[in-house]
């Protein structure tokens, strides 16, 4: 009987071997779990688990899951424990902090941010309709366009929050809020956002695993991209050819203009995913939501009196959303980067190294949607944004205690740092001594004689 109840052990080296399809193991709090079959139904998708299999994932599990998720692990338990199980001082303090926040009820107390934002979005939508349908001046139409851009920004924050935690009274209403704020109002699939955003959170600033840094041929935040890295997220080579070299060489000049048209790329990414062979949760609902957007938006634009006004309406609305695209890049482009998969053993350290906070007064929190506290958000993605400011000093102290970076700077300083990062890579891209992969189309267009 004693033998039956005796614990079974494997080492971390043994655990690493279970990282292939059909044999996927992870460890949480020293207990080993087999997620080979369960990965197909994981609410957060398979990518995040595949990036961490064969290792301890305790910190990531704590960050992304509510307390109710722990009981789901029971039926996945292999019976094995990790013999050489150790917890670093950083992880110990992080877990203690997460437990304290949970005791204080911070994860459950969501405040009224969602209600206020939804009301604000509804008011702006009515304002846009009034400006287009009831006004005749060009100026009023441009104000409506700018208002629409601001609406898209705020609506994206609702979609972002609802993807991390339940912002409504139940999960069904939460899903409705996702589809409304993402697909119907902005034309960007919430399924696409969750697919890429979860991967970004887990592999923060990994050049080959984080999709938010993979913008070849337009941008390269590091010279490591010059060796044509393979994207482990998109499963394709990020070829640094003559076209990429040319574009990257001037990226510090093209950065802001490209941001003005960032939405077009998101539209394209949405359709690429929805028409792909990938398993897409709620594909039909995502299609329906996108159809709603591409019904009301062109119809609204068509109500303007002539084509020049229609063009400038679209241009202005897209340009306003550049503020949000810039914010996304300010949080990461100039932070530390690395090549390789994320690791569970230094999860906190990687989040601290890969993020930059934007300092602002509290009355501007609505504008940034909580993302100005980027490190706090990455450490506690389920924490409602109304609490991010109050936990910021605690996070800062923890970083100071363990000699980890805590970068917080003004909007202007972050812009300067980002441009300098792009400029540094741009100048190195111009070095003809660095070999590049030949682009046959480019070569043909530039052949003389």
From Swiss-Prot:
Tissue specificity comment: Highly expressed in flowers. Expressed in roots, leaves, stems and siliques.
Motif Histidine box-3, chain ranges: 374-378
Cofactor(s) demanded: Fe cation
Motif (Histidine box-2): 197-201
Stored SUPFAM superfamilies: Cytochrome b5-like heme/steroid binding domain
Origin: domain of life: Eukaryota
UniProt xrefs under Pfam families: Cyt-b5 (PF00173), FA_desaturase (PF00487)
Record localization: Endoplasmic reticulum membrane
Gene Ontology CC terms, in alphabetical order: endoplasmic reticulum; endoplasmic reticulum membrane
Entries under CDD domains matching the protein: Delta6-FADS-like
Parts of the chain that traverse the membrane: 113-133, 138-158, 173-195, 255-275, 284-304, 311-331
EC number: 1.14.19.29
UniProt keyword list: Electron transport, Endoplasmic reticulum, Heme, Iron, Lipid metabolism, Membrane, Metal-binding, Oxidoreductase, Sphingolipid metabolism, Transmembrane, Transmembrane helix, Transport
Disrupted-gene phenotype: No visible phenotype under normal growth conditions, but mutant plants have strongly reduced levels of unsaturated LCB sphingolipids in all organs and show enhanced sensitivity to prolonged low-temperature exposure.
Residues engaged in binding heme: 42, 65
Top-level class of the enzyme under EC nomenclature: oxidoreductase
Function, in words: Plays a major role as delta(8)-fatty-acid desaturase which introduces a double bond at the 8-position in the long-chain base (LCB) of ceramides with or without a hydroxy group at the 4-position. The enzyme produces both the 8E and 8Z isomers (in a 4:1 ratio). This structural modification contributes to the quantitative partitioning of ceramides between the two major sphingolipid classes, glucosylceramides and glycosylinositolphosphoryl ceramides.
Comment field on protein domains: The histidine box domains may contain the active site and/or be involved in metal ion binding.
Protein name: Delta(8)-fatty-acid desaturase 1
Naturally occurring in which organism (per UniProt): Arabidopsis thaliana (Mouse-ear cress)
Phylogenetic classification of the source organism: Eukaryota, Viridiplantae, Streptophyta, Embryophyta, Tracheophyta
